[in-house]
């Protein structure tokens, strides 16, 4: 449901407008993207190539539209686009389908001058607590991931 004109993207724009509207000095400093699991496993009839092409096309359109709408409210001339991988435990169970989507995410973010953050070795909630939730990172892994995102943000801002 992510895509220009689709419900989740409309919600993203609504929330962005709301946040920016709270104070005229509010600025967008980065675009953090951490989605794609559903795109990896839904539409079983899609080949890996179709999954890749569809996801890349949707992300490129979304990121481009977002930049066009909000470039005047960005903190810097170039808005850092940062994305991350999936939980290892979930990824291993869905590797074939996920590789196409992850490749699309990586290439799209990098084409916008952004960075892709690796998530290998980070534990899921299930691995930490045994609760069956293998798609979300546990609290400790989220802290590590946040630090990795910030390092990517700093590197982009420095032009590396």
Model-derived regions, located:
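Cell-envelope and extracellular/periplasmic
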Residues: 1-160
């Amino acid at each position: 449901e992510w895509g220009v004109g689709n419900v989740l993207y409309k919600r993203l724009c609504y929330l962005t407008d709301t946040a920016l509207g709270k104070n005229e000095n509010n600025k967008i400093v980065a675009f953090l993207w951490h989605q794609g699991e559903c795109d990896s496993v839904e539409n079983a009839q899609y080949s890996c190539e179709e999954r890749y092409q569809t996801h890349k096309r949707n992300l490129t359109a979304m990121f481009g539209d977002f930049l066009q709408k909000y470039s005047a409210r960005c903190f810097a001339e170039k808005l850092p686009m940062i994305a991350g991988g999936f939980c290892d435990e979930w990824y291993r169970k869905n590797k074939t389908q996920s590789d196409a989507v992850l490749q699309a995410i990586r290439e799209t973010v990098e084409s916008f001058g952004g960075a892709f953050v690796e998530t290998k070795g980070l534990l899921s909630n299930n691995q930490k607590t045994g609760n069956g939730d293998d798609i979300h990172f546990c609290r400790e892994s989220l802290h590590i991931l946040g630090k990795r995102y910030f390092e990517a943000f700093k590197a982009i801002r420095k032009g590396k």
